[in-house]
């Protein structure tokens, strides 16, 4: 089949876009993660990019996509508030997997933001959303534009939260195709992939963290907590990158 026409799909109402992607999604559900990446490279337009927060399971999608598409730009939106272990993990994986890392940050430094707005993450949902818009959404939008992305790979999984439970393999977000190759993987499959390829979880996994973001909005998992409750004080699951 010829490559899907992104411009034509973007001209459709959202409901019609979903319907137009129903047939490809039905096919993609039957494929392996590796086959989904190969399908996307064959049927979706470039440029291609991969985003990563370098979180708990980040090594999976970074390894999987990069081995099929070496040198694919890997977008990291750096808030300046990541854990020291995360920055060390970024360096380790970038070296080990020979990643083409592209780091994007807000126009205002963390210190300047705090001077202007206070600690936004302590200001309820509205504060968190403003923080995410400044530090996550705007830098990602800039990255997609500067890298001329038309197809965006990400490592989301349905098992991670209720907000991700019904996501399709293929969608259109921020005006580009978005592909989620490991969307249907469970924790066991993630573990098996890491073991098979000699990869590691994020260093904080061993300290009881199920999900890792910024230091000020990430909590260790405790018995009785859902994974999504370990982020943003349980007020939100998404940082804004995967919404909209």
From Swiss-Prot:
GO biological process, one term: hydrogen sulfide biosynthetic process
EC class name: oxidoreductase
Organism whose genome encodes this protein: Salmonella agona (strain SL483)
Coiled coil stretches, renumbered: none
Main location: cytoplasm
Subcellular location: Cytoplasm
Matching InterPro entries: PAPS/APS_Rdtase, PAPS_reduct_dom, PAPS_reductase_CysH, Rossmann-like_a/b/a_fold
Keywords on record: Cytoplasm, Oxidoreductase
Functional note: Catalyzes the formation of sulfite from phosphoadenosine 5'-phosphosulfate (PAPS) using thioredoxin as an electron donor.
Family matches, as SUPFAM superfamilies: Adenine nucleotide alpha hydrolases-like
Gene transcribed to yield this protein: cysH
Pathway(s) of this molecule: Sulfur metabolism; hydrogen sulfide biosynthesis; sulfite from sulfate: step 3/3
Reactions catalysed: [thioredoxin]-disulfide + sulfite + adenosine 3',5'-bisphosphate + 2 H(+) = [thioredoxin]-dithiol + 3'-phosphoadenylyl sulfate
Annotated catalytic residues: 239 (nucleophile)
One of the record's GO molecular function terms: phosphoadenylyl-sulfate reductase (thioredoxin) activity
PANTHER family: PHOSPHOADENOSINE PHOSPHOSULFATE REDUCTASE
EC numbers: 1.8.4.8
Record's protein name: Phosphoadenosine 5'-phosphosulfate reductase
